[in-house]
């Protein structure tokens, strides 16, 4: 008779032994088992798990073999946004970052980590067991790729401690694995990947995890998201991550002055040239984690870190043509067509030139020979014109005077660099607005691709976003269009119907309000759970919009201008009548009228239980308007330890003053 207890113990012992061997081999580069010994133990475990699947552990190393096939990836909201980093393309910009921190803090240090050229990922563990892995996605929502990540040898399926935590890192493909993969694809007559990053990105989104397992992806982990697990410094955090079993890039350096930082970066730049994986710079972080909250963040990136980009290699090409693209706002963007050339591993045939002033400053002309590189190792850019090769009949490039779409005269405001087509009936502007409205981060109607939208626009089926939701009334017309059968049309209508339930942040972004990108939309929907409340507050109490951290005057005025336009209000009304929700999917943070509603509040001194940003957020959620300076219009002064001159001024102006204890009581009132 089979002893099931012994079988269960054997499976557990083999699992632990093999996981330990994986850690020794892939993370510590110090294998204790030979390949033959490892393979024999793995084969034994596979046989036992097949016969007794009830004893298979959720962190079994057999998961790294793959075999699970997804139909599609589900989308999951990140616990906290996966933000991008601001860039420094030279030492001057890096020095500006350093000086900004040095003005605020007399003593701090920095950690410089290699910026791995890969794919950002978030890993979540429960009681030390990996249970979820997400791509970065748009920073707020990511795709679940757990089965694929389980196949990566360096990812611990079980930590050395039974912790609940979330970590973030970068998945990458080594250069040697990339070359091997492309050799295999060449033999199989499959398209080759242009560079290791694209190969890693394409691999991690494979629906079949067996394919992922074969491609030998790697990973480095660099941060913990759980505040209660944070150490005092980033340096200590990296050491802690390594102790949990994570693969941490060993090439990080600490510095306490800008001069020292410069030296460390030079060392890292020299070192990375001999590595078997690609990097595109160094991430400089303030080492002391307790300073991060005070330093703050923008809607897009933390202010306590910056990505310093290494200089990239140049490739030579020739300017063939300069064309102008019309955006949804009417702004014209010049694009340079060049003879296709390989730049940092990918073929480049077009380079964005930003604006006409940029063309003049660089003196870019037709038929010029130019040096092309990738700014930040990502965006193709003309680094310089090779004037020694310029043709003798060359002439400076002359700005066009008419819109390339509608031929209206262009407009340029005094003091600005951009040219605009101000014809609101410009067809290209309307098409670009529709393309933006259906885009992934807006309404995400993926069945309405650019060409389909243009076809429907030319057929006069769609002119404004609201017309998209009337397509179902034109079923017969749609099915008569060449290439649009009943099934394709039904797929479009299904996607359109589904989009009606998109969150307010997506709809706001889709409306294309000037200065209101996805990040700003997300900030606004944390404070307003419907378009009606946002509109009413914008028109009646603009100061409360301005006082929201990360919004400010420019965005507030842009919102005001948008909601004052009757055509915009008419379009919003149509969209609502056609079923678009305009509601936040998160719980409303707007409170019922209370003590703080519409009160102008000023803060002074240090609070014991709140940081300045925390208390500002709480007060704004209560409906308060936060001001920096006291005036006769101020309703309330909140004081903490070591208040400044504002306290005496408030007494002189007879402004109500409350301390932290009373503040907490008022905040807790319903």
Curated annotation (Swiss-Prot):
Please give the cofactor(s) recorded in the UniProt entry for this protein.
Mg(2+); Mn(2+)
Top EC class, one word: ligase
Which species expresses this protein natively? Phytoplasma australiense
Instruction: Write down what this protein is called.
Output: DNA ligase
Per the record, GO CC terms? cytosol
Tell me if Acyltransferase is a UniProt keyword of this record. no
Query: Which HAMAP family does this chain map to?
Result: DNA_ligase_A (MF_01588)
Residues binding Zn(2+), per UniProt: 403, 406, 421, 426
Q: What does this protein do?
A: DNA ligase that catalyzes the formation of phosphodiester linkages between 5'-phosphoryl and 3'-hydroxyl groups in double-stranded DNA using NAD as a coenzyme and as the energy source for the reaction. It is essential for DNA replication and repair of damaged DNA.
One Pfam family for this entry, by name? DNA_ligase_ZBD
Family matches, as SMART domains: BRCT, LIGANc
Query: Which reaction is this enzyme known to catalyze?
Result: NAD(+) + (deoxyribonucleotide)n-3'-hydroxyl + 5'-phospho-(deoxyribonucleotide)m = (deoxyribonucleotide)n+m + AMP + beta-nicotinamide D-nucleotide
Catalytic-site annotation from UniProt = 115 (n6-amp-lysine intermediate)
| Keyword tags | DNA damage, DNA repair, DNA replication, Ligase, Magnesium, Manganese, Metal-binding, NAD, Zinc
> So where does NAD(+) get bound?
35-39, 84-85, 113, 136, 170, 285, 309
Which GO MF terms does the UniProt record name? Answer: DNA ligase (NAD+) activity; metal ion binding
Q: Name one GO biological process term.
A: DNA replication
Q: What InterPro entries does its record include?
A: BRCT_dom, BRCT_dom_sf, DisA/LigA_HHH, DNA_ligase, DNA_ligase_AS, DNAligase_adenylation, DNAligase_N, NA-bd_OB-fold
Asked whether the UniProt record includes Ubl conjugation among its keywords, one would answer no
* NCBIfam families named among the record's database cross-references: dnlj, PRK07956.1
């Amino acid at each position: 008779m089979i002893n099931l207890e012994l079988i269960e113990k054997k499976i557990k012992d083999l699992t632990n032994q093999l996981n330990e061997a994986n850690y020794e081999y892939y993370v510590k580069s110090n294998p204790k088992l030979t390949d033959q010994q490892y393979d024999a133990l793995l084969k034994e475990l596979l046989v036992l798990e097949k016969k007794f699947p009830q004893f298979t552990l959720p962190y079994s190393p057999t998961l790294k073999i793959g075999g699970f096939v997804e139909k599609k990836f589900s989308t999951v909201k990140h616990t906290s946004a996966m933000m991008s980093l601001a860039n420094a393309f030279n030492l001057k910009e890096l020095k500006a970052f350093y000086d900004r921190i040095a003005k605020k803090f007399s003593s701090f240090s920095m950690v410089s980590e290699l910026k791995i050229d890969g794919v950002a990922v978030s890993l979540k563990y429960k009681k030390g067991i990996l249970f979820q892995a997400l791509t970065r996605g748009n920073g707020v929502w990511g795709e679940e790729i757990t089965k694929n990540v389980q196949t990566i040898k360096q990812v611990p399926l079980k930590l050395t401690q039974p912790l609940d935590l979330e970590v973030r890192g970068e998945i990458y493909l080594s250069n040697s694995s990339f070359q091997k993969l492309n050799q295999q694809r060449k033999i199989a007559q499959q398209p080759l990947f242009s560079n290791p990053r694209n190969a890693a990105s394409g691999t991690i989104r494979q629906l079949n995890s067996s394919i992922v397992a074969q491609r030998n992806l790697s990973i480095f982990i660099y941060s913990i998201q759980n505040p209660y697990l944070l150490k005092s410094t980033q340096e200590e955090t990296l050491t802690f991550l390594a102790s949990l079993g994570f693969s941490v890039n060993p090439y990080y350096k600490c510095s306490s002055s800008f001069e020292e930082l410069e030296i460390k970066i030079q060392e890292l730049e020299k070192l990375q040239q001999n590595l078997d994986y690609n990097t595109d710079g160094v991430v400089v972080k303030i080492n002391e984690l307790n300073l991060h909250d005070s330093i703050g963040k923008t809607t897009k990136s933390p202010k306590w870190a910056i990505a310093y980009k290494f200089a990239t290699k140049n490739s030579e090409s020739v300017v063939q043509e300069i064309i102008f693209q019309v955006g949804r706002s009417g702004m014209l963007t010049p694009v340079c067509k060049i003879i296709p050339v390989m730049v940092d591993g990918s073929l480049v045939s077009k380079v964005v030139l930003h604006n006409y002033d940029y063309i003049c400053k660089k003196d870019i002309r037709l038929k010029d020979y130019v040096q092309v590189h990738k700014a930040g190792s990502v965006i193709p850019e003309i680094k310089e014109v090779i004037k020694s090769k310029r043709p003798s009949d060359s002439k400076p490039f002359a700005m066009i005077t008419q819109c390339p779409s509608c031929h209206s005269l262009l407009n340029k405001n005094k003091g600005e660099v951009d040219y605009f087509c101000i014809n609101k009936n410009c067809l290209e502007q309307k098409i670009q607005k529709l393309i933006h409205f259906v885009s992934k981060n807006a309404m995400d109607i993926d069945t309405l691709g650019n060409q389909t939208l243009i076809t429907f626009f030319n057929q006069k089926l769609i002119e404004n976003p609201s017309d998209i939701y009337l397509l179902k009334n034109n079923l017969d017309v749609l099915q008569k269009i060449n290439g649009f059968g009943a099934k394709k049309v039904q797929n479009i209508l299904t996607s359109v119907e589904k989009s009606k339930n998109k969150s307010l942040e997506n709809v706001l972004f889709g409306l294309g309000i000037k200065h209101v990108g996805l990040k700003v939309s997300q900030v606004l929907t944390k404070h307003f759970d419907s378009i009606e409340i946002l509109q009413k507050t914008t028109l009646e109490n603009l100061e409360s919009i301005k006082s929201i951290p990360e919004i400010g005057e420019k965005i507030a005025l842009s919102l005001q201008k948008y909601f004052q336009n009757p055509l915009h209000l008419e379009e919003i009304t149509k969209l609502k009548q056609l079923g678009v929700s305009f509601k936040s999917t998160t719980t409303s943070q707007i409170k019922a009228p209370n003590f703080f509603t519409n009160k102008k509040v000023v803060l002074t001194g240090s609070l014991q239980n709140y940081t300045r940003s925390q208390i500002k957020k709480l007060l704004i959620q209560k409906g308060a308007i936060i001001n920096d300076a006291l005036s006769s219009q101020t309703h309330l002064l909140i004081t903490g330890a070591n208040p400044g001159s504002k306290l005496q001024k408030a007494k002189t102006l007879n402004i109500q003053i409350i301390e932290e204890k009373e503040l907490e009581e008022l905040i807790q009132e319903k």
